[in-house]
């Protein structure tokens, strides 16, 4: 609201220092008739996918000299600090093709995907390991960047042959974030696991070979 009645209109320009975090009503116009009636500036939070915590923006209210009563030209700008609270949480999602992961000792493969739930400010590196590399091996690492964070990447599970009659064997595939090589916001994210089953290709029996 103005502190005194103007002889003509007074136009206030309102700007945000970071429109990626907060936008504002752009102008207010006071006249000799409404100068003492408060007008509202609406500040609106802007969503992004970046894990950036609470961000402060400076809202500046200034007199538009070219469109205002000359008596207000020398009035100094005033500012308000607006804080935008982040709604993005570090995490990742695994999706198994067909809802399960199965391979065979004949060397068949199956895949599941990994994707980040929020955009990091720097790389996030995953380490993938198999609890039994004698039954199933896996893609060893995945790297997500600020640019490809929302594009699912494949982890390939490959069955490993042996000569043992051991039936169907389950292996635990662990997907974990490599803290030392990843964005700090993801350091506390828990590991996730996938169970992979390997079907045996060995059959009990014996072979006779006749000499001559």
Predicted regions and their residues:
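Short boundary segments that mark the start of a structured unit
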Residues: 1-212
């Amino acid at each position: 609201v103005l502190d005194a009645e103007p002889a003509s209109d007074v136009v206030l320009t309102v700007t945000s220092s970071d429109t990626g975090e907060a936008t504002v009503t752009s102008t207010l116009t006071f006249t000799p008739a409404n100068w003492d009636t408060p007008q509202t500036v609406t500040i609106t939070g802007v969503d992004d996918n970046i894990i950036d915590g609470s961000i402060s923006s400076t809202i500046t209210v200034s007199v538009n000299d070219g469109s205002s009563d000359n008596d207000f030209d020398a009035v100094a700008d005033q500012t308000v600090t607006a804080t935008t609270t982040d709604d993005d949480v570090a995490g990742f999602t695994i999706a198994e093709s067909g809802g399960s992961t199965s391979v065979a000792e004949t060397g068949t493969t199956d895949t599941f995907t990994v994707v980040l739930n929020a955009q990091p400010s720097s790389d996030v590196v995953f380490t993938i390991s198999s609890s039994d590399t004698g039954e199933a091996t896996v893609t060893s690492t995945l790297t997500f960047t600020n640019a490809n964070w929302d594009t699912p990447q494949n982890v390939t599970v490959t069955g490993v042959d042996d000569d043992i009659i051991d039936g169907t064997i389950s292996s635990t595939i662990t997907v974990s974030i490599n803290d030392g090589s990843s964005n700090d916001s993801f350091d506390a994210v828990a590991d996730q696991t996938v169970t992979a089953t390997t079907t045996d290709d060995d059959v009990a029996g014996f072979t006779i070979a006749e000499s001559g």
